[in-house]
Amino acid sequence: MKQVIKYKNREEWLQNRSKGIGASEAGTVLGLNPWETPYQLWRRKKGIDPPKVENFAMVAGHLLEDAVAQFFKRESHCHIIKASTDDYTITNTDTPYMRVSPDRTFWRTGATHNEASKSILECKTTQMQIDADDLPKHWFCQLQMNLGVGEYKDGALAWLTAGREFGYRDIDFDPEFFGWMRDEITKFWLDYIVGNQEPPAYSAQDVLLKSPLHKAGKEIEATAEIGDMLIELKEIKEKGKTLENRQKEIEDNLKLFFGDAESIVDGNGRTLATWKAPKASEKFDAKAFQADHPEECAAYIKQVQGARRLLIK
């Protein structure tokens, strides 16, 4: 059974997001969000990393929700429900840690204006070109979680690309997909958030977060697959070196041809290449300052741990 929680202001709504898994985080839990991994989400939820601060893109997306909704209304002729513009959260008594806040709800043309006939609209602003037949997977997950927790039968994803192109797609609720997603989110919440287990690394960045330093002397035996990867990587690096050497050779020959000229042009005067010195700039001579004022510098010198380097032997 669903429950609706209303808030006094957006700040209160933002604070409430930390109490569960939001629809925008569903794709992350499933490993389908290109911007964040399950491990990084876990670190944020557990307070290891600071909470997300609304950046310009996030604020702009919120402010432009109404514009996207109006484009959707214009194209689809659906009725946007005004009350749905407020900040609120829908939860379900069965899974109270799954918390959704649909951007808008609407009634389709000809539908009876009652609760059972409502549909959900998710509004997106993006710089990416969107293919309506191949929508971003984390967008799809977000809408399905909104539909499932909110107990709606269908909805739509609408997007505005670079402020110039608008598109939308109607999407039905998929009970089978939602059931699988609910199970995965439940496992993530109970095992990692409530159970305090640390999730496995999902990317190389996760490994650096988990293990910024190596364990001296520790060795692991390569599997056949890893052995093949190492051989392939060495071959790729060798090809890269060959290309880099050829690139340098060509650049050196071009510079010999330039002499003291600024540009190389074709027979029609079109510029093909330039070789110019940058304008002179002022630079603080740290080494000279340290030599002249060693005591003052000593108070500001600190040890900085370098990142782990991958070397192929």
For each predicted feature, which ranges?
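Accessory terminal regions of nucleic-acid processing enzymes
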Residues: 1-313
